[in-house]
UniProtKB/Swiss-Prot annotation:
Compartment annotation: Plastid, Chloroplast
GO molecular function, one term: large ribosomal subunit rRNA binding
GO cellular component: chloroplast; cytosolic large ribosomal subunit
Protein name (Swiss-Prot/TrEMBL): Large ribosomal subunit protein uL14c
One family name in Pfam for this protein: Ribosomal_L14
Subunit structure and binding partners: Part of the 50S ribosomal subunit.
Length: 122
């Protein structure tokens, strides 16, 4: 469950390391974002000499949350951190690699490019 002022790790190689959520987009509850929701965030920590710089405002999709996600078959899934992947206006990732496991729900929400880059889909 991600809300405004929440910090997230960045799970790609776009150059950002941490982002802070400043707005939740396109969800039934605009206060909280879950896995697969698009957020607007500001880069708080970034690697040098990369395309994404510190204090850039970026769009990102949430790929992991510490809050347990309940699936329709009764199984719940929970990750060890809150993480997001930075995307462009066409919902394609800005980086070329994705790190760590990714939830299967992203495939249902038309983020198949991110799912194909992920090393593990849970």
């Amino acid at each position: 469950m991600i809300q405004t002022q929440s910090y997230l790790n960045v799970a790609d190689n776009s150059g950002a390391r941490k982002i802070m959520c400043i707005r939740v987009l396109g969800t039934s509850n605009p206060s909280y974002a879950s896995i697969g929701d698009v957020i607007i965030g500001v880069v708080k920590d970034a690697s040098p000499n990369m395309p994404v710089k510190r204090s850039d405002v970026v769009r990102a999709v949430v790929v992991r949350t510490r809050k347990a996600l309940r699936r329709t078959d009764g199984m719940s899934i929970r990750f060890g951190d809150n993480a997001a992947v930075i995307i462009n206006q066409d919902n394609n990732p800005r980086g070329t690699r994705v790190f760590g496991p990714i939830a299967r729900e992203l495939r249902d929400k038309n983020f198949s490019k991110i799912v194909s880059l992920a090393p593990e889909v849970v």
